């Protein structure tokens, strides 16, 4: 169950777009305004709907269906890497358990001879 949840979170973060419920328009994780221009591209942090913005976010900002659809969550790359590490550790533990079970079956079969 935890693996599925972590995978869902990872996929959502990789899509770089989260749709919030109308009651919660403020993202949980967000860079401070004074740092946003220095650390992220202007097409992501631009809040104006001017025609000079290029890229895929320009079409989204010009056609706002509702105010909460344009909310973006900006995270550092450490978060997805951390989630990948968790998923990798879980896969290693599962593989080790499977190998131990296989070894136990082999030893039980050899012990019967």
From Swiss-Prot:
Keywords: Amidation, Glycoprotein, Hormone, Secreted, Signal
Molecular function terms, GO-annotated: corticotropin-releasing hormone receptor 2 binding; corticotropin-releasing hormone receptor binding; G protein-coupled receptor binding; hormone activity; hormone binding
Biased composition (Low complexity): 37-61
Signal peptide as annotated in the record: 1-23
A GO cellular-component term linked to this record: extracellular space
Pfam family, one: CRF
Region (Disordered): 37-64
Modified residues annotated as Valine amide in this record: 110
Residues making up the propeptide: 24-71
Gene Ontology biological process terms, A to Z: adenylate cyclase-activating G protein-coupled receptor signaling pathway; digestion; hormone-mediated signaling pathway
Tagged with keyword Glycoprotein: yes
This protein's record includes keyword Secreted: yes
Mod. after translation: Glycosylated.
Compartment(s) of residence: Secreted
Entry-linked PANTHER family: UROCORTIN-2 (PTHR17575:SF0), UROCORTIN-2 AND 3 (PTHR17575)
Assembly information from the UniProt record: Binds with high affinity to CRF receptors 2-alpha and 2-beta.
Function: Suppresses food intake, delays gastric emptying and decreases heat-induced edema. Might represent an endogenous ligand for maintaining homeostasis after stress.
UniProt similarity note: Belongs to the sauvagine/corticotropin-releasing factor/urotensin I family.
Protein name per the record: Urocortin-2
